[in-house]
């Protein structure tokens, strides 16, 4: 079977155009927003500001933290002793969800009306094709 190089080029060009118009890939604004929210969360925990850390959690995640601890979020978040996150290594945004890889930790975030919120933290990769294991996650 022979393949016409012009036809392949036209097809790839059309696919690229559709991808751009259809929103393939994350916008820099979404990547920046998710990264900034994750860094604020990590900085709050590093500073011992658990109140701010709780404010940056997604509602279901915060509810789960309080339910598991049978108490308020701040002290419960402190007791989790999440790993200290450092420099950003990368961010992947998939629609309204993001994964932020930082030195020492991986965070998962979702976009809400009020901005990006942390849905899971203290996450470690498992064997290939297995989900991350997270110390902090919503219900």
Where are these regions (language model features)?
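Short, charged low-complexity linear segments at domain edges
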Residues: 5-6, 48-50
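C-terminal motif of bacterial Sec signal peptides marking the signal peptidase cleavage site
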Residues: 20-23
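Surface-exposed, charged secondary-structure patches
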Residues: 3, 27-31, 65-113, 120-128, ...
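Short, well-ordered alpha-helical segments enriched in acidic and aromatic residues
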Residues: 49-62
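Short, aromatic-enriched amphipathic alpha-helices that serve as compact interaction elements
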Residues: 32-48
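Bacterial N-terminal signal peptides that target proteins for export
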Residues: 1-12
């Amino acid at each position: 079977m022979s393949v016409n190089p012009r036809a392949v080029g036209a097809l790839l060009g059309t696919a690229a155009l559709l991808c751009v118009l259809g929103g393939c890939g994350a916008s820099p604004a979404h990547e920046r927003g998710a990264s900034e929210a994750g860094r604020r969360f990590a900085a709050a925990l590093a500073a011992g500001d658990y109140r701010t850390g709780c404010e940056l959690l997604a509602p279901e995640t915060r509810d789960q933290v309080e339910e598991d601890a049978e108490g308020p979020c701040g002290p419960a978040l402190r007791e989790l002793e999440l790993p200290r996150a450092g420099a950003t290594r990368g961010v992947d945004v998939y629609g309204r969800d993001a994964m932020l890889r930082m030195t020492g930790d991986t965070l998962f975030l979702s976009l809400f009306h009020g901005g990006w919120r942390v849905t899971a933290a203290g996450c470690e990769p498992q064997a290939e094709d297995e989900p991350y294991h997270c110390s902090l996650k919503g219900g």
